């Protein structure tokens, strides 16, 4: 049976016909890859289409823009829910599904397979061809997108196929990296990408070869280098407990690089499809399959947060007309109609933020809290408040920064107007007591809770990162599922730690799968903690 890791044996399904020139998956390469309208290989090289064509697919495949149903399985019915941002009103599979920890293997395969099909496979093809033809800028760009995608996959599953991608063992299997090995490779690849892009960023006369294909920065090399530094800082902070020495070293690389990081929201890493609606719009506002999560209501209504109306719409439920209402995860869901009147997402247009200035400042705040050297930052509070300021600016409500940073408001108790069993009362251990206003007298744990709570609000709607940070830190305080169908894997009152390895791996890469479970260091279930989850 063909396995999708076997890049040398399978064709890469690229979006654009020009991208066939990159994959080279056929014996009839010359004839198939000759444009019948007169664009030969020389033409394609001249405007970089031969190398740039696959990048649309890669960029749109990280947070999958189309088809919508694949995004629903890739992210919406897992990380979107586990992050606390969303909950479905639809009792899928007779209400025995991911939302209450009865994991649906048929859904969860897509997290893995879409990453390899849409990003890893075309990225490796571009890297190989760019290396062969002396185009280090395209090689670097593909490496960066590969790291951005695959760290997310590792953060969902743990061990991952990365350094051995395309390397087939004699028994037909492919070997996984442990998560520690994968992170070491991510950092090494960021080193390589930075080395290759630096000459282009330093020389303004270099042609901006990415311009026609770059859905984020329009081909600006300097901004891509800043993104590399910012991504490195994200990954460094991620491993602070698992490998403190490596974390400090990598953070120092990011924080001292002369090009700097993403520090203003005008430079946010936001993928703009330009003509494809963010699938969350369709899933929420057309299909009616997703609504606001209860923690969003508790925090953002409680804080009178100025971003709330940019994130969600007021509900239409008869029991709470005009209110911003969220659904608690893992509840009894007799039918789709009961909670359909709760808050839908506000239209996100064609954009998806994946790494923002706000996140960078919250990373700096945590680094400073850890006692790391953070150039240009005098205090944890300074970086924390700058994170809030950049997030408010990103969402067009920057004028309310002063009032918000001085707010002592608290999250509100959660009330389900349809079932009081789902309520979270005042004084509950699951209801946070932190305010936006910085508490410099608080303990380090309380300060970390403030940082990550505001970071969680600012990351919206990037649920993979939000869920990852919740698992790593325990913040913000979210509400556990009411109905727990994990068969004891997740103790009541606790939370999912990862997603099982995809069924396709058990079926087509059995030896690799067994090695991955060994490297995971625990059972292949949703209760096993990842390497960085200390």
Labelled PLM ranges:
Residues 1, 25-26, 58, 147, ...:
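Terminal processing/anchoring signals of secreted or surface-associated proteins
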Residues 25-79, 125, 132, 476, ...:
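Membrane-proximal, proline-rich intrinsically disordered regions
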Residues 70-74, 312-314, 463-472:
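Short coil/turn segments at secondary-structure boundaries
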Residues 392, 396, 404-534:
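C-terminal functional modules
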């Amino acid at each position: 049976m063909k396995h999708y890791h076997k890049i040398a044996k399978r064709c890469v399904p690229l979006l654009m016909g020009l991208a066939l020139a990159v994959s080279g998956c056929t014996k009839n390469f010359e004839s198939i890859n000759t444009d019948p309208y007169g664009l030969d290989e020389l033409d394609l090289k001249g405007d970089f289409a031969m190398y740039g064509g696959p990048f649309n697919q890669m960029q749109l495949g990280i947070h999958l823009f189309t088809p919508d149903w694949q995004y629903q399985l890739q992210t919406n019915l897992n990380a979107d829910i586990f992050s606390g941002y969303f909950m479905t009103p639809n009792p899928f599979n007779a209400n025995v599904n991911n939302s209450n920890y009865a994991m649906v293997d048929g859904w969860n395969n897509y997290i893995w397979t879409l990453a390899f099909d849409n990003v890893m496979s075309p990225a490796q093809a571009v890297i190989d061809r760019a290396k062969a033809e002396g185009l280090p800028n395209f090689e670097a760009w593909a490496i960066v997108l590969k790291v951005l995608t695959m760290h997310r996959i590792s953060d969902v599953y743990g061990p991952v196929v990365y350094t051995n991608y395309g390397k087939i063992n004699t028994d037909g299997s492919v070997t996984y990296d442990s998560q520690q090995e994968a992170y070491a490779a991510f950092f090494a690849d960021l080193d390589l990408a930075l080395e290759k892009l630096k000459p282009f960023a330093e020389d303004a006369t270099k042609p901006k070869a990415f311009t026609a294909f770059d859905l984020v920065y329009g081909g600006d090399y300097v901004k891509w280098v800043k993104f590399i530094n910012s991504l490195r800082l994200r990954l460094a902070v991620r491993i602070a407990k698992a490998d403190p020495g490596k974390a400090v070293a990598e953070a120092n690389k990011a924080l001292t690089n002369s090009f700097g990081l993403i520090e203003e929201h005008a430079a946010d890493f936001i993928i703009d499809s330009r003509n494809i609606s963010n699938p969350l719009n369709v899933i929420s506002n057309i299909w009616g399959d997703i609504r606001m999560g209860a923690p969003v209501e508790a925090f953002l209504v409680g804080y009178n947060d100025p971003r709330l109306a940019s994130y969600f719409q007021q509900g239409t439920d008869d029991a709470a007309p005009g209110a911003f209402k969220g659904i608690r995860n893992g509840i009894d869901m007799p039918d789709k109609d009961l909670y359909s009147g709760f808050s839908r997402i506000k239209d996100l247009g064609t954009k998806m933020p994946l790494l923002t200035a706000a996140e960078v400042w919250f990373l700096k705040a945590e680094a400073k809290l850890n006692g790391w050297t953070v150039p240009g930052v005098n205090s944890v509070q300074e970086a924390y408040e700058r994170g809030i300021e950049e997030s408010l600016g990103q969402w067009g409500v920057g004028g309310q920064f002063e009032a918000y940073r001085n707010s002592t408001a608290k999250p509100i108790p959660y009330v389900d107007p349809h079932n009081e069993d789902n309520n979270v009362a005042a004084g509950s251990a699951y209801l946070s007591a932190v305010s936006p206003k910085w508490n410099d007298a608080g303990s380090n744990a309380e300060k970390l809770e403030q940082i990550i709570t505001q970071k969680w609000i600012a990351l919206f709607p990037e649920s993979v990162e939000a869920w990852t940070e919740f698992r790593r830190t325990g913040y913000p305080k979210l509400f556990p599922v009411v109905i727990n169908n994990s068969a004891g894997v997740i103790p009541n009152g606790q939370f999912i730690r990862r997603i099982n390895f995809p069924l396709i791996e058990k079926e087509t890469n059995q030896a690799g799968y067994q090695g991955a479970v060994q490297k995971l260091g625990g059972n292949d279930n949703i209760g096993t903690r990842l390497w960085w989850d200390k």
